[in-house]
Curated annotation (Swiss-Prot):
It is a peripheral membrane protein. Transmembrane segments: none annotated. Gene3D superfamilies: 2.40.30.20, ATP synthase alpha/beta chain, C-terminal domain, P-loop containing nucleotide triphosphate hydrolases. GO terms for molecular function: ADP binding; ATP binding; proton-transporting ATP synthase activity, rotational mechanism. Its EC number is 7.1.2.2. It is an enzyme of class 7 (translocase). GO terms for cellular component: plasma membrane; proton-transporting ATP synthase complex. This is ATP synthase subunit alpha. CDD domains: ATP-synt_F1_alpha_C, ATP-synt_F1_alpha_N, F1-ATPase_alpha_CD.
Length: 513
């Protein structure tokens, strides 16, 4: 058989012409629906849960629903210019935010972009917003205090480094004020702070930033903002972004404090997203995983051991533990702590500070209810002198409230009951404290010492505030060395007790209040 070269070349040409290249774009899709910040995409075969999707105009969305023939994604920011038919691409990345010391003193949005007009941020790298919390073996028990500067909190509901302490109460009752004062009190302690504002008015946040700056605490603080006017996706992700920024310090053997203000609004934003994605609603129309929404966030607040820090820093930092302390805020409706989100967060956290409307309206600020407020782990971290002196404060207030209710119906009271009532009234008055005036350990110790040792008995009820102010001024000027020792060591012994007693005896003799 003779082969004809012409025939062979014609046959090859024919085969080449008939050959069809069938390619399938697995990482590019088309928007088929846009509504309320949610887009539905067809054609993204290789997308992963939580992956960032690139949209036209250098914007991004996050894939949350992976269905058989479409993907539900939530847009990070404005979505008005998106239209059906727009092409989108997968990125192979999850959402990351800038972290580092360059963020301290700055106001940023959920994505870590500066919104304070102070120019670009010099960050130390990027960190994913969703991080797995440290494991059991990597953690260390809480045994170092975080001083809030509030007598009522530091004496009765102490907070430790690495703890999660919920601040809960109705609106306009002083929840944010308590958290902001706790941040202000850290300006000289070395604890780095993160304040996350979720779903608040821009004017309110501007006021908070101004107050932090006035009191010299902004240089030590990162403010993460997702205002009420921003997309629900940004409000939902803001706490996770702030947490990653706080974890940067924890993982390098430092201490940090994060305030989530507030997680009720984050839960509402997540409910909005879930309902728009057509996920089945549960109790109060929240999705089934709203508990996990908060638990995976709050579990990241922890105290990690020196081995974890050494491993993370590749041996650069040795022998130092790190901590991230969380103060989540929850807003209740008419004091109802049995609602869905409040009960969830109460069960996740290591205690709660309950602020009560009736106490607030009666003039008690901070309006802490010591009866149902608790710190489950903070007792081990409490400063020695405060722990020793404040043992009777909580019981005195509890007995006072009980007797005060009873005494309304009883006409004649015995001397012991009357003495308990009078002591309780004075302790309640002593627990009052002005906003933006956090107290040092020594100042708190002197105030509590005066109550515990009976120095308030001879003071008129309406003069207790003046008595305390004059006493602290006297002690800081006449017994400066003692106050310095208490602040530096936090110890309490017979010598310190003797000096405190001598100082108070001398002050009471002066009658200068």
């Amino acid at each position: 058989m003779q082969l004809n070269s012409t025939e062979i070349s014609d046959l090859i040409k024919q085969r080449i012409e008939q050959f069809e290249v069938v390619s399938e774009a697995r990482n590019e899709g088309t928007i088929v629906a846009v509504s309320d910040g949610i887009i539905r995409i067809h054609g993204l075969a290789d997308v992963m849960q939580g992956e960032m999707i690139e949209l036209p105009g250098n914007r991004f969305a996050i894939a949350l629903n992976l269905e058989r023939d479409s993907v539900g994604a939530v847009v990070m920011g404005p979505y008005a210019s998106l239209a059906e038919g727009d092409k989108v691409k997968t990125t192979g990345r999850i959402l990351e935010v800038p972290v580092g010391r360059g963020l301290l003193g700055r106001v940023v949005n959920t994505l870590g972009e500066p919104i304070d007009g102070k120019g670009p941020i010099d960050n130390d790298g990027f960190s994913p917003v969703e991080m797995i919390a440290p494991g059991v073996i990597e953690r260390k028990s809480v045994d170092q205090p975080v001083q809030t500067g509030y007598k009522a909190v530091d004496s009765m509901i102490p907070i430790g480094r690495g703890q999660r302490e919920l601040i809960i109460g109705d609106r306009q009752i002083g929840k944010t004020a308590l958290a902001i004062d706790a941040i202000i009190n850290q300006k000289d302690t070395g604890i780095k702070c993160v304040y996350v504002a979720v779903g608040q008015k821009a004017s309110t946040i501007a006021n908070v930033v101004r107050k932090l700056e006035e009191h010299g605490a902004l240089a030590n603080t990162i403010v993460v903002v997702a205002t009420a006017s921003e997309a629900a996706a940004l409000q939902y992700l803001a706490p996770y972004s702030g947490c990653s920024m706080g974890e940067y310090f924890r993982d390098r053997g430092e201490d940090s404090l994060i305030v989530y203000d507030d997680l009720s609004k984050q839960a509402v934003a997540y409910r909005q997203i879930s309902l728009l994605l057509k996920r089945p609603p549960g109790r109060e129309a929240y999705p089934g995983d709203v508990f996990y929404l908060h638990s995976r966030l709050l579990e990241r607040a922890s105290r990690v051991n020196a081995e974890y820090v050494e491993k993370f820093t590749k041996g650069e930092v040795k022998g130092q533990t790190g901590s991230l302390t969380a103060l989540p805020i929850i807003e209740t409706q008419a004091g109802d702590v049995s609602a869905f989100v409040p009960t969830n967060v109460i069960s996740i956290t290591d205690g709660q500070i309950f602020l009560e409307t009736d106490l607030f309206n009666s003039g008690l600020r901070p309006a802490v209810n010591p009866g149902i407020s608790v710190s489950r782990v903070g007792g081990a971290a409490q400063t020695k002198i405060i722990k020793k002196l404040s043992g009777g404060i909580r019981s005195a207030l509890a007995q006072y409230r009980e007797l005060a209710a009873f005494s309304q119906f009883a006409s004649d009271l015995d001397d012991a009951t009357r003495a308990q009532l009078e002591h309780g009234e004075r302790v309640t008055e002593l627990m009052k404290q002005k906003q933006y005036a956090p107290m040092s350990v020594a100042d708190q110790s002197v105030s509590i010492f005066s109550a515990e040792k009976g120095y308030l008995k001879s003071v008129e009820l309406n003069k207790i505030g003046d008595f305390e102010a004059s006493l602290l001024s006297y002690m800081n000027s006449e017994h400066a060395d003692l106050m310095k020792t208490i602040n530096e060591t936090g110890n309490y012994n017979a010598d310190i007790e003797g000096e405190l007693k001598a100082g108070l005896d001398k002050f009471v003799e002066t009658q200068t209040w």
